[in-house]
Amino acid sequence: MKTLLLTLVVVTIVCLDLGYTLKCNQLIPPFYKTCAAGKNLCYKMFMVAAPKVPVKRGCIDVCPKSSLLVKYVCCNTDRCN
C-alpha cells in the first residue's frame, strides 16, 4: 500500500508543472492565457493617437520598442497588462 501511494505521489509531481508560469490578459481582460516557456513578459500595444484603447495584449519574450504610431507597455507579473 505504501509503495502504491509513493508511486502516485511521484507520478503527480512529475506530471505537474512545478515551474512558475506567467498569465497575461488577452485583448479582452477577463480572458487570459498562460504563457509558453521563454515568454516571461506581458505586453499591451496601443496606438499613440488613442492611448486608452489597447490594440493587442499577450505574452512576449522581449519588449518591442515603441514608435511614433505604436506604443508598447510591458510588465512581468500575472495579468498586469
From Swiss-Prot:
Disulfide bonds: C24-C42, C35-C59, C63-C74, C75-C80
InterPro entries: Cytotoxin_Cobra, Snake_3FTx, Snake_toxin-like_sf, Snake_toxin_con_site, Toxin_cobra-type
Signal peptide positions on this chain: 1-21
A biological process from GO: killing of cells of another organism
Tissues where the protein occurs: Expressed by the venom gland.
Any single Gene Ontology cellular-component annotation: membrane
Gene Ontology MF terms: toxin activity
UniProt entry keywords in alphabetical sequence: Cardiotoxin, Cytolysis, Disulfide bond, Hemolysis, Membrane, Secreted, Signal, Target cell membrane, Target membrane, Toxin
Compartmental location: Secreted; Target cell membrane
Other remarks on this protein: Shows a cis peptide bond at 29-Pro-Pro-30.
Assembly and oligomerization: Monomer in solution; Homodimer and oligomer in the presence of negatively charged lipids forming a pore with a size ranging between 20 and 30 Angstroms.
Task performed by this protein: Basic protein that bind to cell membrane and depolarizes cardiomyocytes. This cytotoxin also shows lytic activities, on many other cells including red blood cells. Interaction with sulfatides in the cell membrane induces pore formation and cell internalization and is responsible for cytotoxicity in cardiomyocytes. It targets the mitochondrial membrane and induces mitochondrial swelling and fragmentation. Inhibits protein kinases C. It binds to the integrin alpha-V/beta-3 with a moderate affinity.
Family per similarity comment: Belongs to the three-finger toxin family. Short-chain subfamily. Type IA cytotoxin sub-subfamily.
Protein's recorded name: Cytotoxin 6
Native source organism of the sequence: Naja atra (Chinese cobra)
